[in-house]
Amino acid sequence: MNSKIIEYLRKAGYNPYNDFYPIIETWLNLWKGKTDFHKYKVVYDDKTYEREMYSLGMPKRIAEDWASICWSEKDTIKTSPKNQKYLDNKLQEIKFNKQLVLAIEKSAYSGTCGAVLRVKNIKKFGDELVTDKFSKYDLILMKADQIIPLRVEHGKIIDCAFVSETRIQSKKVYYIEIHELVRRKAEDGEEYETYKIKNVYIDGEGKEVEKKGILKEYYTNSDIALFSILTPPIDNPYPEANGLGFSVYGNAIDQIYACDTAYHNFVMDYYLGGKKVFYNKKLTRRDDKGNIIYPDDVSKQQFQIVGDEMENVNADGLVHEYNPDLRIEDNKSGLQFFLDLLSFKCGLGTKYYQFDGSSGVVTATQYMGDRQDLTINAKKYRENVDEFVENICAGILLLGRLLFKENVNEKDKIEVINTDGFLVSEEDLKERYIEEIAQGLRSKTSYMVRFMGMTEEEAKQELARINEEDSLSSLGLTNEDEGN
């Protein structure tokens, strides 16, 4: 994190932490593919050359796989009937499914993803924000190195600053968007909580820069945040993290390097494993520049001078052929062992990345039924994803009510449903629905729509018939009695 940004926030009265960002930078560099670990030197012909190790690029693959595990386009978001159509339209407008997969990946590799809701092209008249036909929703995703928690309560980020680089008149500046929950007095004098959002631009020296057409400050008149935070379900061991999360491979860096070392060794065995032919010096000549010419040089294959004392080039000691052992099986088993360790340390189970000669990589779907450790960790991550999604949806509905004057309510229940049963089996989900119905937390209609393929109207009609039959049974009437 740029020290000038931290310095600006401290002068503004906040107390941001700065010690955790170097750790985040390590995770980001691994996700990009190469770090200083992958650099090495070789000495050849009395000269030193810098080289770069081959890498499997596993950190990015791990983050991508967690994103695929935790969300499917088949999954659905349900809310009250009056909210549903508006919410569906706005989620489609911001390409939510695509954005959410990227958000999960960002949270996996950097430890935290922040999603900030904005509305483009709005104007302020007095204390009122006004939209027009050009006003549109925007969802901005921030990785951990762009997020500065300002107030944290019980591990939850309440106040936060989001930082991004931009340009004003070709000069690089930093845009700081501050979300702060404050108390404000209503007209009747009663206090209420509301988020205050401030937009600030500073240059590389930490001085504020003016930008036209930007609202410097406004109140949302709601305690619902217009940002949402997603972290992996891992307790961060660093106290200086101040609410930020921990990368899924934050505790597996040694295993990442072990995989890359094994893979590099495997590749180098092939690179150096070509046939070697060693010649006695008697079989070589030098050109007029002093360069050595070998007998298998295509352009010099018949350089031997007539009358040379050496008559038998095939004599022992003159030519020696060497075919290095590629050690394929040893390399494969070693690489597989380190991949098993890596997947275990990243919460994916011991054999998530399993290669065999017939089927290639065993997919998560094939693997899920056999290994419960991945299922348990995935359910925990999915719970965090569900909360992340629900907060974004509540923010969309809030903006719809306040700015776009839509008849929606951000306080209505929002539910994220795992439609494809990837993390929760169909039978387990049925049992959960039945328990919630018995507890009065869910309607019978929702069960019939979800598991019996009915529309809501069909389910209501079927329940009416069931209730009617129950009433007749309680009166001691049957179909035969009705016929008489």
How would you describe each model-predicted region?
Residues 102-106, 117-120, 270-279, 352-358, ...:
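Short coil/turn segments at secondary-structure boundaries
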Residues 210-369, 417:
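Extended, charged amphipathic alpha-helical segments
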